[in-house]
A protein has these predicted regions:
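A cross-family glycoside hydrolase active-site/sugar-binding cleft signature
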Residues: 33-35, 59-63, 81-83, 121-125, ...
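Hydrophobic alpha-helical scaffolding
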Residues: 2-5, 34-35, 58, 62, ...
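N-terminal active-site wall of soluble small-molecule enzyme domains
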Residues: 32, 36-61, 65-71
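Generic secondary-structure signature for well-ordered alpha-helical cores
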Residues: 17-25, 50-53, 111-118, 141-149, ...
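Catalytic alpha/beta core domains of metabolic enzymes, predominantly
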Residues: 162-305
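A mid-to-C-terminal "edge-of-domain" accessory segment
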Residues: 249-390
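Alpha/beta enzyme core
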Residues: 2-27, 47-51, 66-191, 211, ...
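Conserved structured core elements
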Residues: 9-13, 103, 130-133, 137, ...
């Protein structure tokens, strides 16, 4: 929504295939969500379903009407999201209803969804501004009654629509992430496996709030590739992959190397510029410009690299050449650019290193402020080697 140029049908299919590879056979990326209101979206949904993947399961987000329920059921979708906004801002000012009218309307929608043979996923929009005990708990409790009576599981997606959730202990509801997840379980009787967290990053708390929701019992968190989403974005799927690995000590079948392939595809094939410092995905996430850091990387990569980015993400650590790179930065750049290992490695004593250092120093002593590109380095190396037989 309002976040980037929409993907084409072919791009959606390709990204779905990459998500399948990224999540692995254990289905760590459990579900995906499609709109069904344009031919392009419906074509993508149908073609992705034809692939026959178990994971990610294809679900939809639809308007709450019997016609739409029948539409997604006819396609073969088994679960759909329905919007059930729960704050007074939405109930009173957006929909012009009372709380009772909203509750009755929502119960009718959920009943229609079940009657159509679908599993409802109720999106509790704006939950971090809702009356938790006055509306959220009674509504969620009623949904659990319907679930028991019908035998159909009903999920609740707790949506922090404006990113107002707070992860710290002792915070009052409705802004307490832990309080929301705890309250849904213990006051409304919602099982952990029926609770999802949907966060936004307006206050830079997207990832930490999602992790907090996990820790307090939400079985799933909603993510988007690279965190792309409305306004400031949502929770990046690549961030939660490493959060999961940090918490559990295992990737559990995920293949994080596909993060790199996804990032390059989004940047090169969909023309979406990824900020270079984006963790795990940006061009410069494991790049250093400081000579002292390059010196440490040469002695032991673990000193200044967050983990073995080469084996996990197919992204070896890099250095760029600036006025602070020193001979250490130049040596590191040479060895990695030309795959020098062992006895063939350049050292600070090599004549080529000395000449390059002299040239780099001269560049910045004469007013240069931009880093030296790889192409410039290669051109200068060719010039030096030709002139001095280095």
């Amino acid at each position: 929504q309002q976040s980037r140029t929409p993907y084409t049908t072919e791009q959606m299919i390709h990204l779905y295939k990459l998500l399948h590879k990224l999540g692995g056979d254990n289905g760590m990326i459990r579900q995906t969500e499609f709109f069904v209101y344009s031919k392009k979206d419906r074509d993508a949904l149908e073609k992705c379903m034809e692939l026959g993947y178990r994971f990610p399961e294809i679900t939809t987000w639809i308007r709450a009407s019997k016609k739409d329920f029948e539409l997604v059921r006819s396609i073969g979708v088994k679960e759909t999201g329905v919007l059930v906004s729960c704050s007074d801002y939405h109930i009173f000012h957006k929909m012009g209803l009372t709380r009772k009218e909203a509750l009755d309307k929502y119960i009718g929608i959920v009943s229609d969804c079940i009657e159509a043979g679908l599993r409802p996923r109720c999106h509790f929009e704006d939950i971090t501004r809702a009356d938790f005990y006055g509306f959220v708990v009674p509504f969620a409790s009623r949904l659990m009654e319907i679930s028991r009576e019908s035998g159909v599981p009903i999920k609740i997606r707790a949506c922090d629509t404006l990113g107002l959730g707070v992860p710290y202990p002792g915070v009052a509801l409705p802004r307490s992430v832990s309080g929301i997840i705890y309250g849904l379980q213990h006051y409304a009787g919602v099982p952990s496996d029926m609770i999802e967290w949907h966060g936004h990053n307006d206050f830079y708390k997207g990832v930490v709030n999602a992790t907090t929701a996990w820790m307090y019992g939400a079985s799933a968190v909603n993510c988007s590739l690279l965190g792309i989403g409305e306004r400031t974005g949502n929770v990046p799927v690549e961030a939660m992959i490493f959060e999961y690995a940090s918490l559990r000590g295992t990737m559990n079948g995920m293949h994080p190397e596909y993060i790199t392939e996804i990032a390059r595809y989004i940047e090169n094939d969909t023309n979406y510029p990824i900020p270079p410092m984006t963790p795990f995905a940006g061009q410069n996430f494991n790049l250093t410009r400081a000579g002292i850091h390059a010196d440490g990387l040469m002695k032991n990569p673990e000193i200044y690299n967050i983990f073995d980015t080469e084996s996990i993400l197919n992204r070896p650590p890099k250095v760029s050449i600036t006025g602070t790179s020193g001979t250490a930065g130049i040596v590191f750049w040479l060895n990695h650019s030309y795959s020098r290992r062992g006895e063939k490695e350049y050292t600070k004593k090599d004549p080529l290193v000395a000449k390059l250092y002299e040239w780099v120093t001269d560049q910045f002593d004469n007013g240069r402020i931009t880093m030296i590109s790889d192409a410039e380095m290669e051109e200068q190396i060719a010039t030096l080697c030709e002139a001095q037989d280095l």
